[in-house]
Regions:
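Hydrophobic h-region of N-terminal signal peptides that target proteins for export
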Residues: 2-10
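Transmembrane beta-barrel domains of bacterial outer-membrane proteins
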Residues: 20-25, 55, 65, 82-85, ...
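Extracellular loop and loop/strand-boundary signature of outer-membrane beta-barrel proteins
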Residues: 50-55, 102-111, 156-163, 213-219
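Predominantly the C-terminal beta-signal and adjacent terminal strand-loop region
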Residues: 88-90, 176-236
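A charged, solvent-exposed segment within the mature domains of Sec-exported extracytoplasmic proteins
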Residues: 129, 133-189, 193
Length: 236
């Protein structure tokens, strides 16, 4: 007796433990989201000492405002814009660094700068469970920034100042998590892990000497300085 067998291979779906297309979407089509983050810090040092730095007398502040808006053109997918404004100031009256028998000092130094950034955003969500309260997301950012700043040092024999302009063009990927605190208000946490950017800097020293530098970088790296926490309101 001759037995003929036929075998066929069939691709099988692998379940990774989360549902990417739930019966009802985590983020419905047509939803608008608006939100962002802001931060303000100020410091005043009066004869303060920190390790080898003594006699610090300074004032300064940092301001950061990062609004964004996203429109969800498909279920669990959205596009939008992210704007950023950052400003910082440091007025150092005096400070000394003492290491062994070596002492160096600085006085009458001033620095101020501000930066504008604008990025287009594409966002995709991966829901966690069926409760529709928590999800992972990934933001793909394309845009750039422009920065202006000046430093002034009157502590030497002659006063010296430097004016700086800088720009950045970049493509970045920022994954994160979102958790709804109410039906429409959500807390978001994201961090940069991948980026490709081109940056350049122009300097004018004492309104006479010119300087220039540029750089290009690309790679995977967790950027702890890019960790962002903010609130967003969703118009469902």
């Amino acid at each position: 007796m001759l037995v003929l067998g036929a075998f066929c291979a069939e691709a099988q779906h692998y379940d990774r433990g989360y549902e990417t297309v739930p019966s009802s979407p985590f983020m419905p089509k047509g939803t608008w989201a608006a939100g962002g983050s802001m931060k303000y810090t100020q410091h005043i040092n009066d004869n303060f000492s920190l390790m080898v730095i003594n006699g610090i007398n300074s004032t300064g502040y940092n301001v950061s405002v990062h609004p964004k808006v996203i429109y969800h053109f498909r279920e669990n997918m959205g596009v939008g814009l992210r704007f950023s404004y950052d400003r910082s100031m440091l007025d150092l009256a005096s400070a000394e660094i003492s290491v062994a028998d070596i002492t160096m000092g600085a006085k009458d130094c001033y620095q101020i700068s501000h930066k504008y950034s604008l990025h287009g955003v594409y966002r995709a969500y991966i829901p966690l469970g069926n409760a529709k309260r928590i999800a992972m997301f990934a933001d793909v950012l394309l845009g750039g920034s422009f920065k202006q700043g000046k430093t002034f040092n009157a502590g030497g024999t002659y006063a010296a100042g430097t004016y700086t302009t800088a720009g950045v063009l970049e493509l970045a990927v920022d994954p994160g998590m979102i958790a709804f605190l109410t039906d429409r208000l959500a807390l978001e946490l994201n961090v940069g892990i991948f980026g490709v950017n081109y940056s350049w800097t122009n300097q004018t020293h004492n309104q006479v000497d010119m300087g220039y530098t540029d750089s290009t970088s690309a790679g995977f790296m967790v950027n702890l300085l890019s960790i962002g926490v903010g609130l967003s309101y969703y118009f469902l």
